[in-house]
């Protein structure tokens, strides 16, 4: 055993992270990292992707007074900076002609502006590709740690998006090759497969991807606690929904999915 990670006490109050009357004129956060790498104390390594916070900052940066309706608009914003940045990176790394299925997803996604509205087909394509990338990049290595290790990793939504960023930014290339095959896969190979797999996934679960919109596949049901009782649920359903839901975990309008 080691005492390295034993409890050492509380962070001194005057060394706690804070922001007081910043020059930008406002304080905002979207559960994203609030400290720099030089901060001497451990607070957390499980920060939200910076996407939500970035879009909130974009909106608040405008030199204008905000009323209640303006703030409602900020909180309901459905633009994803993560999508804006990485959709073109995904499409640039896809080889057109790889497969008819992959090409169809490519055509849905190219030119997307990152707005995750309920009538957007590109949002469907982006999230399908993103989730297949997570699977194709990490499942092979994590498999060696046990059959449920990937499921545990997948459930950590903040970590998976930050990991994707690092891989496409060239900081974590060891994850790219599929260690379960004899070939040496490149990132281009993994992206090609992920575009193809995204089409297969959507087709099997929902139907023709070209006919899908974000509001059809991304929905919310507001569940009543009494619905947990099977007898009560048989008699009456107190839950309401499902309703189409714009946005995602990457937008100020927080709408993560499982």
Feature names for model-found ranges:
Residues 1-101, 111-258:
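C-terminal/peripheral segments of proteins
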Residues 104:
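Active-site acid/base region of carbohydrate-active enzymes
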